[in-house]
């Protein structure tokens, strides 16, 4: 079975910025989400962005004066982040999400794990570990913000086919295959050549996390939790350390 890291390296990373709507549109969307969160981050505060990708949230945060540690397993997406962030205070780190504690040198005021990143973890116990580690690192009043897709209730029939994006040269469609604790995500990419269409297919597993389970886990680790609607139909949990 292809891992999430392998899936991104060989399939999604080369088209990820396009998939997100293009650089400018994606950064505008990330900036709008940061505005909606109204984070109490002041200039010089340290923020961790887990699963930062090409910087959709890291760059808007850095533009607001935060010092961002951006962690991701994709070297290609991090290279794009470095190019886009320029001289902004963003440190790009290629590592596993669960290794984020080893990259903390100053107390963070917020930890972000957004864009369905948390469902890429290999098992539910890894999600619990991430929450426990975040609780240990954040000060009283610090924020852990998680956004993810709720796969706990399966889609049926043709609902499992999800158009992601298309233009005159590319078509990306996602197909979901539900298992007991995970969903098998098939990303089907068609790309036009000079005289034909090429098809590439890859799949990987995501966790079927329910909002209720995550809220309970966050609360048991000393967070007050607010649930709200996130971008593109995602669930967003804003957890504040007590």
Regions found by a protein language model. Name each.
Residues 55-100:
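Class I SAM-dependent methyltransferase SAM/SAH-binding core
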Residues 211-242:
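C-terminal lobe and adjacent flexible extensions of AdoMet/dcAdoMet transferase-like proteins
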């Amino acid at each position: 079975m292809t891992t999430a890291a392998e899936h991104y390296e060989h399939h999604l990373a080369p088209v990820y910025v396009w998939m997100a709507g293009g650089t400018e549109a994606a950064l505008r969307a990330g900036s709008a989400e940061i505005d909606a969160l109204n984070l109490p981050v002041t200039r010089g505060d340290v923020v961790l962005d887990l699963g930062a990708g090409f910087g959709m949230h890291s760059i808007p945060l850095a533009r607001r004066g935060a010092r961002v540690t951006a962690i991701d397993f994709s070297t290609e997406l991090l290279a794009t982040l470095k190019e886009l962030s320029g001289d902004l205070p963003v440190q790009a780190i290629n590592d596993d999400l669960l290794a984020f504690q080893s990259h903390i040198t100053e107390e963070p005021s917020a930890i972000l794990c957004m864009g369905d990143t948390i469902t890429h973890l290999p098992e539910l116990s890894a999600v619990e570990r991430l929450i426990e580690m975040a609780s240990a690192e954040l000060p009283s009043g610090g924020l852990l913000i998680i956004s993810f897709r709720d796969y706990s209730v399966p889609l049926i029939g043709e609902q499992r086919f999800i158009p992601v994006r298309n233009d005159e040269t590319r078509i990306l469609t996602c197909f979901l295959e539900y298992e007991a604790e995970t969903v098998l995500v098939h990303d089907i990419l068609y790309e036009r050549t000079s005289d034909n269409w090429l098809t590439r297919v890859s799949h990987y597993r995501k966790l079927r996390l329910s909002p209720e389970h995550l809220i309970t886990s966050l609360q048991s680790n000393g967070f007050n939790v607010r649930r709200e609607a996130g971008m593109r139909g995602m669930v967003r949990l804003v957890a504040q350390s007590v």
